[in-house]
Design a protein with these regions (language model features):
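Basic/aromatic-rich interaction segments and small domains that mediate binding to polyanionic partners
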Residues: 2-47, 51
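Intrinsically disordered, low-complexity linker and terminal regions at domain boundaries
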Residues: 50-59
Length: 59
C-alpha cells in the first residue's frame, strides 16, 4: 500500500485519518485522526495500523 501526503486512510480501530507527514514511507506517518468520540488528534501511526487507503491525494 503506497501512502502519500494528505491521503485519507481507515485505521484498524475503525477511525479515519489524514496523513500530514511521512516519516518513513511504508513505516511511519503523522496523521490527524478522527476519533470515534468526534475529536481530532494528531498522532504518529505505523503502516500496520492502516487497514486501507480511502482516498489518494492529487499531489
Amino acid at each position: 500500500m503506497d501512502i502519500k501526503l494528505h491521503d485519507k486512510v481507515r485505521l484498524k480501530t475503525g477511525e479515519t485519518a489524514s496523513i500530514v507527514e511521512i516519516y518513513e514511507p511504508g513505516v511511519a506517518y503523522e496523521a490527524d485522526i478522527d476519533r470515534l468520540d468526534g475529536s481530532i488528534e494528531t498522532d504518529t501511526i505505523k503502516q500496520e495500523d492502516i487497514l486501507i487507503a480511502l482516498t489518494e491525494s492529487a499531489a
